[in-house]
């Protein structure tokens, strides 16, 4: 835990929407009278029929029900496109930066309107109507945003499947939600490599024996693909046959907007269901206040639209606010490790939102690739996806932002729809590694294992005591699983699945998933804490920590460590790291086993697959489960070969 504090400079407080006093009064109003607070802020989007009911929610066991603005009628595409046409039709809505630096495209709000309406007409002509599900399996190209908004325009429900998922994973998701139409591309491009998207779609449909009537194929690479007459059509040919006028369907606030599948701790992926009104109000409001978005800013979130961050903070939040949002097809280190910083300079990006794993991997390459670029346009930095260790936070602040850009370290989940705990740049002093304070209307509590609410400075499990507008409504087709997963552990409260520490200032520090907690000799140890200690060592680039069975302690600590470029793994360094962690946290946190690894198993979105690391640490690598989402499967073979916990020396 870092004890450094960065106070809010007066220029941040003066320029931002909210300073500390304003935050305190708005937050108090939001939790003391949520009906009045959200009744007012719900008006930030346009309604065809204004709501008269604001909040109708229950977390009671057996009666979990979440409704916001339930009698209001609106349309998400209308709010993200049409309502901007009169005042900013010629403003750029989407800057697209391709995988290759010589490909980019600017799309104005007027052009966006035309593209969305044409695709909506293509879908409607193929029988897609309100309530139908459409699966989107596309790379990070503008058509992904067009497809989302075209579905929303019709009141259809989109289910985006990340382009890195295998045909098996795609098939499961298509079958679960009953999609009748899939929008895909011939191939994707990522880091100069082609991804066979259309071939994957064909393989997925073959697995589920029909049900998919239409496949719309964007020509991204021009690669040759099989096209089934009557089912498959090229996007450009279909949109050339229709007009660019399509009325926006009148949609109830509680009608579904999208399903997004997220991994469950057990069983098949959960279809997280988000609805229309509350979700858009929350995505829009959090985007404005947390990123301090002002008209004219160029905003870039580096996520993929296949993840919730891409839904809320590339497409829906920014476009609802009339922003200019940047979509990036590529990866941080292609064609060079300066790519992020080159894109920032090329497009004069003001607000930059990325993941700690990207920051750590770029740290590994040193400061020179950053410092050879200007980055003078940057005003604010953000972090999302996992707790950011203080060392990476400090590097991001010092090297990337040159100590002039606040960092918003945002905590939220697929299930929450938008950011729940975060600094506000003009209001919140910053502590490296802390997500700081709750956003308006969010009521976090820290509870012990029995569910007792802890007061003051404490450590325990993070729950949310009451609903907020962006909250998921159910697991698609399985409300019982929704209640069981999120509301049964601590009845009457939403259980986040994360551990949390609250300090004397009331700031929240996310300590990692509760299933990423190791119990060492009866002491609970958050893996994120041990990882932070390891990564604070100057020779360590990245670390992942898991538990493994230990005869005496119950669980031991197994650390996978990736070193900085040029550093050699030695027995001396191994001992040095054990001593380092002992000093940083205490003897209880000493790693029992340290495995030096050239890389860690990550999904294509950059998340470390800890499940695989746990299996290898337990010497159970024969049953690694689904590894189809791995960015580099070769990493796993190296980890297995060099594992430190072999059952016998000859293994």
Swiss-Prot record:
This chain's function reads:
Catalyzes the conversion of acetate into acetyl-CoA (AcCoA), an essential intermediate at the junction of anabolic and catabolic pathways. AcsA undergoes a two-step reaction. In the first half reaction, AcsA combines acetate with ATP to form acetyl-adenylate (AcAMP) intermediate. In the second half reaction, it can then transfer the acetyl group from AcAMP to the sulfhydryl group of CoA, forming the product AcCoA.
* Modified-residue entries (N6-acetyllysine), positions: 607
Q: What are the recorded GO MF terms, alphabetically?
A: acetate-CoA ligase activity; AMP binding; ATP binding; metal ion binding
Q: Which residues are listed for CoA binding in this entry?
A: 190-193, 309, 333, 521, 582
**Encoding gene (name):** acsA
Q: How is it modified after translation?
A: Acetylated. Deacetylation by the SIR2-homolog deacetylase activates the enzyme.
Q: Which organism is it from?
A: Xanthobacter autotrophicus (strain ATCC BAA-1158 / Py2)
Catalytic activity, EC: 6.2.1.1
What's the protein called, per UniProt?
A: Acetyl-coenzyme A synthetase
């Amino acid at each position: 835990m870092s004890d450094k504090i960065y106070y809010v400079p007066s220029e941040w407080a003066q320029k931002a929407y909210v300073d500390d006093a304003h935050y305190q009064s708005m937050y108090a109003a939001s939790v003391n009278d949520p009906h009045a607070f959200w009744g007012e802020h719900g008006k930030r989007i346009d309604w065809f029929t204004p709501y008269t009911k604001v909040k109708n929610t229950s977390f009671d066991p057996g009666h979990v029900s979440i409704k916001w603005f339930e009698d209001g009628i609106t349309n998400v595409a209308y709010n993200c496109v049409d309502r901007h046409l009169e005042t900013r039709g010629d403003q750029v809505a989407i800057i697209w930066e391709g995988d290759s630096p010589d490909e980019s495209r600017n799309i104005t709000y007027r052009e966006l309107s035309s593209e969305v309406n044409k695709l909506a007409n293509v879908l409607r002509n193929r029988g897609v109507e309100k309530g139908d599900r459409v699966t989107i399996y596309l790379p990070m190209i503008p058509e992904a945003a067009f497809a989302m908004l075209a579905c929303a325009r019709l009141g259809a429900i989109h289910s985006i499947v990340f382009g890195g998922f295998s045909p098996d994973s795609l098939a499961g998701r298509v079958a679960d939600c009953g999609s009748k139409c899939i929008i895909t591309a011939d191939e994707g491009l990522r880091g100069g490599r082609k991804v066979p998207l259309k071939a994957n779609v064909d393989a997925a449909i073959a697995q589920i024996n029909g049900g998919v009537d239409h496949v719309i194929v964007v020509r991204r690479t021009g690669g040759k693909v099989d096209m089934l007459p009557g089912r498959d059509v090229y996007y450009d040919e279909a949109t050339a046959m229709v007009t660019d006028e399509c009325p926006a369907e009148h949609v109830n606030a509680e009608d579904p907007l999208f399903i997004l599948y997220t991994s469950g701790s057990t069983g098949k992926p959960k279809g997280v269901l988000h609805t229309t009104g509350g979700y858009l109000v929350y995505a829009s409001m959090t985007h404005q206040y947390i990123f301090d978005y002002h008209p004219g800013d160029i905003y870039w979130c580096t996520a993929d639209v296949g993840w919730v961050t891409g839904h809320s903070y590339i497409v829906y939040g920014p476009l609802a606010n009339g922003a200019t949002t940047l979509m990036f097809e590529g990866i941080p280190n292609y064609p060079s490790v300066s790519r992020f910083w080159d894109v920032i300079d090329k497009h004069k990006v003001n607000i930059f939102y990325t993941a700690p794993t990207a920051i750590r991997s770029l740290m590994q390459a040193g400061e020179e690739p950053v410092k050879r670029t200007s980055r003078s346009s940057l005003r604010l930095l953000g972090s999302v996806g996992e707790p950011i260790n203080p060392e990476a936070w400090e590097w991001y602040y010092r090297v990337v932002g040159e100590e002039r850009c606040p960092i918003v370290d945002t905590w939220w989940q697929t299930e929450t729809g938008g950011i729940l705990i975060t600094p506000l740049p003009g209001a919140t002093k910053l502590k490296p590694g802390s997500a700081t304070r709750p956003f308006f209307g969010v009521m976090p509590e820290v509870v012990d294992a029995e569910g007792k609410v802890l007061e003051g400075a404490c450590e325990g499990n993070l729950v949310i005591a009451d609903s907020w507008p962006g909250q998921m409504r159910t697991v698609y087709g399985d409300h019982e699983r929704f209640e069981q997963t999120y509301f049964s552990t601590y009845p009457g409260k939403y259980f986040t699945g994360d551990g949390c520490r609250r300090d004397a200032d009331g700031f929240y520090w996310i300590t990692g998933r509760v299933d990423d907690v190791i119990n060492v000799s009866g002491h609970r140890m958050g893996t994120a804490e041990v990882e932070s200690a390891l990564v604070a060592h100057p020779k360590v680039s990245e670390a992942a920590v898991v538990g493994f069975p230990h005869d005496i302690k119950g669980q031991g600590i197994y650390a996978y460590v990736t070193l900085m470029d040029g550093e050699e793994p030695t027995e001396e360094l191994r001992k040095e790291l054990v001593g380092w962690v002992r000093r940083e946290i205490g003897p209880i946190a000493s790693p029992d086993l340290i495995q030096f690894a050239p890389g860690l198993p990550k999904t294509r979105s950059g998340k470390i697959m800890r499940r695989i690391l746990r299996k290898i640490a337990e010497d159970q690598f024969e049953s690694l489960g689904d590894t189809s989402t791995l960015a580099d499967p070769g990493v796993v073979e190296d980890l297995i070969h060099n594992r430190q916990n072999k059952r016998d020396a000859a293994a």
